[in-house]
Amino acid sequence: MRTEYCGQLNLSHVGQEVTLCGWVNRRRDLGGLIFIDMRDREGIVQVFFDPDHKAAYEQASELRNEFCIQITGTVRARPDSQINKDMSTGEVEIFANTLNIINRSEPLPLDSNQTNSEEQRLKYRYLDLRRPEMADRLKTRAKITSFVRRFMDSHGFLDIETPMLTKATPEGARDYLVPSRVHKGKFYALPQSPQLFKQLLMMSGFDRYYQIVKCFRDEDLRADRQPEFTQIDVETSFMTADQVREVMEKLVRELWQETKGVDLGDFPVMTFAEAMRRYGSDKPDLRNPMELVDVADLVKDVEFKVFSGPANDAKGRVAALRVPGGAQVTRKQIDEYGQFVGIYGAKGLAWLKVNDRAAGVEGVQSPIAKFLSAEVLEAILARTQAESGDILFFGADSFKVVTDAMGALRLKVGRDLALTKLDSWAPLWVVDFPMFEDDSEGGLSAMHHPFTAPKDMSPEQLAAAPTTAIANAYDMVINGYEVGGGSVRIHRTEMQQQVFGILGINEEEQREKFGFLLDALKFGTPPHAGLAFGLDRLVMLLTGTDNIRDVIAFPKTTAAACLMTDAPSFANPASLQELSISVVAKKGATDSSVEENQ
């Protein structure tokens, strides 16, 4: 039906007759001529209809936005005065000879001239995706996945599919369950990741595996989370953590070069402990130059209990954040920052403005200055490398509260005061995570997942001191986003059973949930390691949006609903009966449709 795409026409096509298919992006009448901007997947080109071509001209008078049309015409060069430098096709236009209105459009529920609500955009997603910026994002996504496949193929990785209907295993989030009609009362789980299957593929001898795969997690959603998401999943045998990182870093560097024309350079490597200490986050945004500076040793003996209390507590922390040029911040802004850190459990936010560094303590302004000696103030100014015009913010509380609150404040202030270089890229690897962390019930949970191997520990050593164990794990972070994470896996039965035991999984439960894995580990399992990238998050970064829904064709809302199809929906009672499922309404429920399905 077409000979060319609208957005690919240029001066090399001048004089050629072309047939185009697409949509009316805009129509306007000028001096007896009818002009339209015609749009397809590749872009927009201007088409004009002359009254001398009566049939096409009369039809063109009927055109409205989003009519689906086909035109045949001749490509002409625009006069210099009419060249549109904002369009890739701005040097040419089409003189239409024939017009075929394929399909008409009703008035749109979306307004192309203003910002529509996200609810409207998601409800009419098929119209929202016609917008060039949305189409460009999905085209970029397609190019990224194509590039990844070429790279992985060229490095000896095999694309192998793993099951979508599998067994529920504890991986940190709730599973989406699928009832079995054949096996009454039993349920499949949609995979949170292909973790165990890719490990089993290594045990099967496939050596290098990858897959671009859908994963499912029933968890609370944020702007960068979806209930169904896509991973670039990777696993290798006989490779160390350093070797895995080397190949995956090469993939990302080449991807950025291909997509953005940017050389990311070598990725620095930082331990988890260093990242938390300096930046208050295990995914630090290194575009922001500010760092947290520990000052507990300087304030241990001061009479100001807000500082000396945490400074003398083994589980406490006192940290300062120097904000270059921050003395301009108003008292109102400081109060707002105090409220902000309260979200993270901080009880307040102490501050100190450095008006004149050369004047020493006489050049500072702060409500806490009177509680600190000249020697302590000078020591704090020296350690933080404070300069005239700076402000220091202080956090003093438990290590977790201070780290979380000051880390979040660092990011907020960096954006508020334009200190974060938003037009740059700052990748790094974060390594040496704790193997375990405290859970809400007083036990331990795996910081990554229960199949991660510890660094340099035997099962006996791990059992004796689990809280000191360091995981052989690594995360790739770019601009404050964790874009990928992985680890060396446990490849011995004894170690895997020991980890399960530390996590409170008894032998009976181990056999019930992971018997197949424990059996497989007995048969010459090779050392193996892997990593998974969040494809959606990578595309989000590479297309410059801060909302993951912008890079998914048909995403869910933060309530895990599809406004376009009205999913999830109530099931037919006959289907539920066939599955031996009874829907029980919550106490106090008033939804009649729930009651009907009881």
Swiss-Prot record:
Where does the protein principally reside? cytoplasm
Residue ranges, annotated region (Aspartate): 195-198
Q: Which GO terms describe its biological process?
A: aspartyl-tRNA aminoacylation
- Quote the subcellular location field of this record: Cytoplasm
- What's the EC number here? 6.1.1.12
Residues annotated to bind L-aspartate: 171, 217, 448, 489
What are this entry's molecular-function GO terms? aspartate-tRNA ligase activity; ATP binding; nucleic acid binding
Which Gene Ontology CC terms are recorded? cytoplasm
Query: Which reaction does this chain catalyze?
Result: tRNA(Asp) + L-aspartate + ATP = L-aspartyl-tRNA(Asp) + AMP + diphosphate
The UniProt record lists the keyword Aminoacyl-tRNA synthetase: yes
Top EC class, one word? ligase
| Keyword terms | Aminoacyl-tRNA synthetase, ATP-binding, Cytoplasm, Ligase, Nucleotide-binding, Protein biosynthesis
Q: Where does ATP bind?
A: 217-219, 226, 482, 534-537
Instruction: Report the HAMAP family cross-referenced here.
Output: Asp_tRNA_synth_type1
Q: What does this protein do?
A: Catalyzes the attachment of L-aspartate to tRNA(Asp) in a two-step reaction: L-aspartate is first activated by ATP to form Asp-AMP and then transferred to the acceptor end of tRNA(Asp).
Subunit: Homodimer.
Q: Return the PANTHER family for the record.
A: ASPARTATE--TRNA LIGASE, MITOCHONDRIAL, ASPARTYL/LYSYL-TRNA SYNTHETASE
- Family (UniProt): Belongs to the class-II aminoacyl-tRNA synthetase family. Type 1 subfamily.
UniProt protein name: Aspartate--tRNA ligase
What is the species of this protein? Yersinia enterocolitica serotype O:8 / biotype 1B (strain NCTC 13174 / 8081)
